[in-house]
UniProtKB/Swiss-Prot annotation:
Catalytic activity: 2-C-methyl-D-erythritol 4-phosphate + CTP + H(+) = 4-CDP-2-C-methyl-D-erythritol + diphosphate
GO biological process: isopentenyl diphosphate biosynthetic process, methylerythritol 4-phosphate pathway
Gene3D superfamilies registered for this protein in UniProt: Spore Coat Polysaccharide Biosynthesis Protein SpsA, Chain A
This protein's name: 2-C-methyl-D-erythritol 4-phosphate cytidylyltransferase
Length: 232
C-alpha cells in the first residue's frame, strides 16, 4: 500500500546549539534533511512527502529542493507553534484515505525494511510505532536526588516513523485540539482516545534522532559503518 509521509521540520533544535535549524547542518557534505528525504524518495511506496516548515525558512527549503532534485512530490506546508500543531497542518495536506507516516526530519537513518514492517502493521491495526527496548537502567530523579528506580523490562524507547490510518490520526488530532491535550508524540494522541490502541514494531538502535552535538559524532560513525558494509 502506498503512503504519504509528514516530516516536521520547523523546530530550531536548541539542544544542538547550532544557532540555526539543525536540519541544515551538513553530514558528509549534505544537509541532514536531505539525507532524510532521500530515504523516502527512494522508497517505491512513498507517494508524497509533506515537509512542514517555519514559514520564515521557506526560501531556504525551496533552494535546497532546487539544489537536490527529488522524484517524489514534496509539498512545503507552514507549521504551527508546537510540533503537534505542525503535524496536524501537514496531515491536512493528505488528499485521500491512506496510511500516513509521521517522521522526525532529524532521523536520517531509518531503513526501508523498517518502514515496510511498520506499514504492514498499521494496515492491520490502524496505528503502529517503531521502538527499541531500553538498555540502560532508568531512575526517576528530583532535584538531583534519586527517588525511584524504574523496572526497565517493559520500557521501550519510541522512535519514528509512526504509521497510522489517516482517518484515525486526524480524529486523534481533532480530539486532542478540542481537549487542549498536548502529547509528546502522535501515538500518544491515539492512546488518549477511547479504545485507542497502538502496536509496536521493533526498530533499530542506529535510528537515532540528532538532538545534541554528540549525536552528530554518532551519525558520522553510523555513516562510516554503513559505507564500509557496502564494500564488504
Amino acid at each position: 500500500m502506498s503512503y504519504d509521509v509528514v516530516i516536521p521540520a520547523a523546530g530550531q533544535g536548541k539542544r544542538m546549539k547550532a544557532g540555526r535549524n539543525k536540519l541544515f547542518i551538513e553530514l558528509k557534505g549534505d544537509p541532514v534533511i536531505i539525507h532524510t528525504l532521500r530515504v523516502f524518495d527512494s522508497h517505491r511506496q512513498c507517494d508524497k512527502i509533506i515537509l512542514v516548515i517555519n514559514e520564515q525558512e521557506r526560501e531556504h527549503f525551496q533552494q535546497l529542493l532546487s539544489d537536490y532534485p527529488f522524484q517524489t512530490s514534496i509539498e512545503l506546508v507552514a507549521g504551527g507553534d508546537e510540533r503537534q500543531h505542525s503535524v496536524y497542518k501537514g496531515l491536512k495536506a493528505v488528499k485521500q484515505e491512506k496510511i500516513v507516516l509521521v517522521h522526525d526530519g532529524a532521523r536520517p537513518f531509518i531503513k526501508h525494511e523498517q518502514i515496510d514492517e511498520l506499514i504492514a502493521e498499521a494496515e492491520q491495526t490502524g496505528a503502529a510505532i517503531l521502538a527499541v527496548p531500553v538498555k540502560d537502567t532508568i531512575k526517576r530523579v528530583q532535584d538531583l536526588q534519586v527517588s525511584e528506580t524504574i523496572e526497565r523490562s517493559s520500557l521501550w524507547a519510541v522512535q519514528t516513523p509512526q504509521a497510522f490510518r489517516l482517518s484515525l490520526l486526524m480524529k486523534a488530532h481533532a480530539e486532542a485540539e478540542r481537549k487542549g491535550f498536548l502529547g509528546t508524540d502522535d501515538a500518544s494522541l491515539v492512546e488518549q482516545m477511547e479504545g485507542g490502541s497502538v502496536r509496536v514494531v521493533e526498530g533499530s538502535y542506529t535510528n537515532i534522532k540528532l538532538t545534541t552535538p554528540d549525536d552528530l559524532t554518532s551519525a558520522e560513525a553510523i555513516m562510516e559503518s554503513e559505507s564500509g558494509n557496502k564494500h564488504v
